[in-house]
Amino acid sequence: MTGAARRPRKLKVMSASAFANTFAGNPLDRASDRRVDAAWMANRLAAPESLAVAMWNGRPLIEDAKSGGVQIAYLRAQMAGELSEGGERLLFMGLWKDVAVFALDIEGPADPADGPLAGLGRFEDLRSIALTLTAGDAAILATAKGVFEWRRRHRHCAVCGAASEPAEGGWKRICPSCNAEHFPRTDPVVIMLPVNGERCLLGRQAAWPKGVYSALAGFLEPGESIEEACARELSEEAGLKASAVRYHSTQPWPYPSSLMIGLIAQVEDGEAIPDQTELDEVRWFTRGEADALIRGELADARAPGAMAIAHQLIKAWANGG
């Protein structure tokens, strides 16, 4: 192969939610039923029309898009297979109509764009380029990054410690010693905007960039419902009591493996007191101030960037949601 593969056409994505955050909206058919068919997988990997996404140390191979921004620089899957160390570094991503799409995980200090992938694109940090990608490309890359991050952290069996082996297109690892099966993990996180009348509460940590305020958040614990986790986090971090919890949207967040569950939480009257562990400061914002915050018009405060679900929660409430 002498150049990057042609780019597939855009697929219209149907979602159960009216709102899709950055990294949501993967346009591929995951075709999970095909993962167990090793012969089918090998056939598709060898097919000349099959494509592959390449990632080096978590950074995707991208190229400039003619319409502006950047896009995935697809490889031929055959080439990815040749670089995959016998399949250890391959992931079957799914189907684009009848075209199989794989992902290749490359590790090491040497930039492959200066070696075997020279002239095919460049590797850049996913978080830095996320908003310059199409929603579909960002979601595809987030999926690959999330699975590869899991693979790096779970190369050995959690039961007996033996080195595990990939199976089912990279979506499972099996221990050859005790036969334990391991699957990619997803850690649910509740992230909520506390609201009391015409004001919302945001918090900040001293380690954050100066002036940045964000929604409150915390990991869901075993045995908790989403609503219970939201109420617990509000009580722990800000001393507030939730009276009602409303779902907004979710966001896959592959750093390394979170699913952000966005909520609007009605809270009872009371003094908001930061716990000084998770939050160093909390501050109430009126609806007008929240709108100005999102627009970057407050002199002493800033919102998280638009790719963050916290930004979208604040924006939705400021706009009357």
Regions found by a protein language model. Give the residues of each.
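Hydrophobic alpha-helical positions that pack around
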Residues: 216, 230, 234
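Nudix hydrolase/Nudix homology domain
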Residues: 3-154, 165, 209-213, 275-321
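Short, well-structured beta-strand/strand-turn elements
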Residues: 165-168, 239-248
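N-terminal strand-loop-strand
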Residues: 173-215, 219, 241-242
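Active-site-adjacent beta-strand/loop module that shapes the phosphate/pyrophosphate-binding cleft
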Residues: 251-274
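Surface-exposed, charge/polar-rich loops and edge strands
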Residues: 224
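Cys/His-rich short segments
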Residues: 143-193
